[in-house]
Amino acid sequence: MIPVVQGGMGVGVSASRLSSAVARENGVGTIASVDLRHLHDDLLAESKINPSEEKYTQLNCTALDREIQKTKADANGKGMIAVNVMKAVKDHAAYVRQACESGADAIVMGAGLPLDLPEMTEGYHKDVALFPILSESRGIGIVLKRWMKKGVLPDAIVIEHPAHAAGHLGAASVAGVNDAKFEFKRVIEETFEVFKNLGLESEKIPLILAGGMANFEKVKTALKNWGASAVQIGTAFAVTEEGDAHINFKKTLAGAETEHVVEFMSVAGLPARGVRTKFLDNYIKRESKLQANAKADPRRCTQGLNCLTSCGLRDGLAKARQ
């Protein structure tokens, strides 16, 4: 195995094509579980017939199973196949169970504290590795203590730096992503101290650094100087030929300059980072007004998906995206 984990990227950015390509090189290929029905024309068509939340979940589980089976077939028995599940998604438990039943090698969970991941994977602990995504040592300690009560330990911990990663970020606010408590070297040192205090030093739980691992020097520093066991890389894989995203998405991402990257609050109530496209720019210009008029109303979501546990638009959360 090479010490590289391909980050999970949705919707449909990392599915079977990308994850199998990474696995074939003896890395960890990761399928993003969110709303995979969009990659399957028959499932997308079916979802428009008498739509319901339950039907969307069922169809997404079917799509997830298809993606896992195709990844396994195309990986030729090499590497590992992981499934990324967002805790913020309402039906996260269903996707975790489907991933386990479909034969995924690992579950990676972020976008919220994965405190109950051991319960969700009951019966599969010998077969499926568990990788929580966290950003600082306090959260790592909380998760470890909770999991230890269930007799379960993480098979690895992904430490994601909110100032450098893309997608949803593990900070309380946009302003907080640059807090010194998230610095990799500090978090690793503090995490080793947490291991010591909990009597886990001998377990040698691998730490995987995620965020900004964009060149060899950064990877080498993480592995050689800081004590990380591997790195997680997302954006660099997203724009590859093997990536599952639309070509226009890849061109936009690959062509973005540093000044085009912007932080904002996602509809899930978490800080996020992305490219300032025309669509996002129009939203950001109107954000203050939209947030000032936030109100709880399930009808405000035109798709009626009810897909998130907490939704800025549906629940009228003024600090989240509308």
Spans of features found by a protein language model:
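Active-site entrance/lid segments in N-terminal catalytic domains of soluble metabolic enzymes
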Residues: M1-E201
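Conserved active-site-proximal phosphate/metal-binding subdomains
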Residues: V5, P154, H164-F184, I188-K204, ...
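Residue-level detector of alpha-helix initiation sites
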Residues: V13, M213-A214
